[in-house]
Curated annotation (Swiss-Prot):
Catalysed transformations (reactions): UDP-N-acetyl-alpha-D-muramate + L-alanine + ATP = UDP-N-acetyl-alpha-D-muramoyl-L-alanine + ADP + phosphate + H(+)
Gene: murC
Keywords assigned by UniProt, alphabetized: ATP-binding, Cell cycle, Cell division, Cell shape, Cell wall biogenesis/degradation, Cytoplasm, Ligase, Nucleotide-binding, Peptidoglycan synthesis
Subcellular location(s) of the protein: Cytoplasm
GO terms, molecular function: ATP binding; UDP-N-acetylmuramate-L-alanine ligase activity
Alphabetized InterPro entries for the sequence: Mur-like_cat_sf, Mur_ligase_C, Mur_ligase_C_dom_sf, Mur_ligase_cen, Mur_ligase_N, MurCDEF_pg_biosynth, UDP-N-AcMur_Ala_ligase_MurC
Cell wall biogenesis/degradation listed as a keyword: yes
Family in the record: Belongs to the MurCDEF family.
Name of the molecule in the record: UDP-N-acetylmuramate--L-alanine ligase
Recorded metabolic or biological pathway in which this protein acts: Cell wall biogenesis; peptidoglycan biosynthesis
C-alpha cells in the first residue's frame, strides 16, 4: 500500500494507557517513537527496548511518523499534534488504536469504575497459567511480567476498557467484564448517572451475538441495567443469586480464602480458593476471573494456581516491607492507587483485615478538584475511619482550583467531624519526612492517590533504609 503505516508516534508515551499499546505494536514490528513531558522509569524502560523516546514536546519529534497516537490527557495545542494535523498525518485517539489491536485477537475487555487493573491482571494471569499465552494491555505493571503489556502468541487479548472518557465504546470484545458502576468522571456524562449506566449497556452491546457479559450483580447500578442487557450474562458476587458466588470468605495473613459455587448454566464442583491478595473487594475481582475461566473451560488446577501465586500489580496494595519507626520498632509501608471513596473504603478494610489490631495511618493526596467537590462528604467519612491522617493538597490533573474543594477545606471538614485529627501537608515534597516522623512501631502506613504521591513511598524507603534495596514489592 502506498500509505502503509510503518512508523507510529505516541504523544504522552509515559502514560499508563499509552506505553502498553506502544510496546505491543513495537513487538509486532512497527517502528515506534514517543514523547512525554517528563522523564520516567517507563520512558527509560521503553528506550531500553529500542523505542525512540523524547522528553518534552516539539514538532520535530514526529519526523517520519505515519500516524500519531494521543490520549485524552494531551491537549489540542500540543506542538506535535498541531504539526501532525498540518502535515495531514492521522491523529489517532488511544482507544481507537487499542481497538485496532483487538481486531487481531479475540478480545476480553475489563470495564468498571473500580478494580479494572487488578481484574485485568488476574484474568491475564489465569490465561497465562493455563498456557493460553495471552496478549495483554493493562493500566498498571503486572509484577509477574514486569510490564504493562506483552504480545502473546495465543488467540486472546485482555485489555482495560476505560469509561472515564467514554472511549470504551470504541472496543469490540467477544467477552466483557463489568466490575461495578459508580459515580465518577461524571463530567463526561453531563453529570447524569443514567447516561453513565446507559454507556455501560452500549459497551456490552458492542460484542457480537456470541459474546458474553460477566457482571458483578452485587453492585446496585449493575442490577439496574440488567433488564436492558440483551446479550448472555454470567453474574458473580456474594449475593445468593450470583451464578459464580463466593461463600465462607475469610482473611488469612494478607491473603483471602473462600469457597466458590459455580452455577452458570452448568453445575461444577465447588472450589476452595486461596487468593494472594487482601480484601473482600479483591475476592470480587477474583470471581470475575473465575467466571472467565469457566467460559473458556480453563482447568481448575491452572485457575487455582494462578490465584494462589498471583504476584500483584504495581501501586495496588503494593508492600514496601518493614521500615524503622521513631522510638523503635518497625512500621509497614503500603501504596495503593485508590483515589475514589469507594476504592479507599475497600482498601482500608483490606488493611484492617490483613493487619488486625494495628494502628492504620492514611497518607492521602486527593486527585482532581472536581472529584473532591463531588465526593467531599464521602472523603470525610472514609478518612475518619483511619487512626491517623496525613492529607496533602489536591493533585489538579490539569483542572483549575474549585472553591472549598481543596486539601485545606477537606482537612477542616475531617477535623470538624471529630473522628481523627488530620495533619495537613501543604508541600507534597515534605510528605516523606512527615510520614517518617509520625509513624510508630507497629503502624501500617497506607499511601493512597493517583497523582504525584506515587513517588512518595520510594522516597520514604530511601530516607529510612538506605542500606538495603530501595523497594520491596508485594510478597
Amino acid at each position: 500500500m502506498k500509505h502503509a503505516i510503518r512508523h507510529i508516534h505516541f504523544v504522552g508515551l509515559g502514560g499508563a494507557g499509552m506505553c502498553g499499546i506502544a510496546e505491543v505494536l513495537f513487538n509486532l514490528g512497527y517502528e515506534i517513537s514517543g514523547s512525554d513531558l517528563a522523564d520516567s522509569a517507563t520512558l527509560r524502560r521503553l528506550a531500553a527496548l529500542g523505542i525512540a523516546t523524547r522528553v518534552g514536546h516539539a514538532a520535530a519529534h514526529i519526523e517520519g511518523a505515519d500516524a500519531v497516537v494521543t490520549s485524552t490527557a494531551v491537549q489540542s495545542d500540543n506542538p506535535e499534534v498541531i504539526a501532525a494535523r498540518e502535515r495531514k498525518i492521522p491523529v489517532v485517539p488511544r482507544a481507537l488504536m487499542l481497538a485496532e489491536l483487538m481486531r487481531l485477537k479475540r478480545g476480553i475487555a475489563i470495564a468498571g469504575t473500580h478494580g479494572k487493573t487488578t481484574t485485568t491482571s488476574l484474568v491475564t494471569s489465569v490465561l497465562a497459567e493455563a498456557g493460553l499465552d495471552p496478549t495483554f494491555v493493562i493500566g498498571g505493571r503486572l509484577n509477574s511480567a514486569g510490564a504493562n503489556a506483552k504480545l502473546g502468541q495465543g488467540e486472546y487479548i485482555v485489555v482495560e476498557a476505560d469509561e472515564s472518557d467514554a472511549s470504551f465504546l470504541n472496543l469490540l470484545p467477544v467477552m466483557a467484564v463489568v466490575t461495578n458502576i459508580d459515580a465518577d468522571h461524571m463530567e463526561t456524562y453531563g453529570h447524569d448517572f443514567g447516561r453513565l449506566k446507559s454507556a455501560f449497556v452500549d459497551f456490552l452491546h458492542r460484542m457480537p451475538f456470541y459474546g458474553t457479559a460477566i457482571l458483578c450483580t452485587d453492585n446496585p447500578a449493575i442490577r439496574e441495567i440488567l433488564p436492558d442487557v440483551t446479550c448472555p450474562v454470567t453474574s458473580y458476587g456474594f449475593s445468593e443469586d450470583a451464578q459464580v458466588r463466593a461463600v465462607d470468605v475469610r482473611a488469612d495473613a494478607g491473603r483471602m480464602r473462600f469457597r466458590v459455587q459455580r452455577r452458570n448454566g452448568v453445575t461444577l464442583p465447588d472450589l476452595d480458593v486461596v487468593l494472594n491478595l487482601a480484601g473482600e473487594h479483591n475476592v470480587l475481582n477474583a470471581l470475575s476471573a473465575i467466571a472467565v475461566a469457566v467460559e473458556l473451560n480453563i482447568p481448575d488446577e491452572a485457575l487455582l494456581r494462578a490465584l494462589a501465586q498471583f504476584k500483584g500489580v504495581g501501586r495496588r496494595f503494593q508492600r514496601y516491607g518493614e521500615l524503622p519507626a521513631q522510638g523503635g520498632g518497625t512500621f509497614t509501608l503500603i501504596e495503593d492507587y485508590g483515589h475514589h471513596p469507594v476504592e479507599m473504603t475497600a482498601t482500608l478494610a483490606a488493611a484492617r483485615g490483613a493487619f488486625p489490631g494495628r494502628r492504620l495511618v492514611l497518607a492521602f493526596q486527593p486527585h482532581r478538584y472536581s472529584r473532591t467537590r463531588d465526593c467531599f462528604e464521602d472523603f470525610v467519612k472514609v478518612m475518619g475511619s483511619a487512626d491517623a491522617v496525613l492529607l496533602t493538597e489536591v493533585y489538579a490533573a490539569g483542572e483549575a482550583p474549585i472553591v472549598a474543594a481543596d486539601g485545606r477545606s477537606l482537612a477542616r471538614a475531617v477535623r470538624v467531624a471529630g473522628q481523627v485529627e488530620p495533619v495537613f501537608v501543604d508541600d507534597i515534597g515534605e510528605l516523606p519526612r512527615r510520614i517518617a516522623d509520625n509513624a510508630r512501631g507497629g503502624d501500617v502506613v497506607l499511601c493512597m492517590g493517583a497523582g504525584s504521591i506515587g513517588a512518595v513511598p520510594a522516597k520514604v524507603v530511601e530516607m529510612l533504609r538506605t542500606d538495603v534495596p530501595a523497594m520491596q514489592e508485594d510478597r
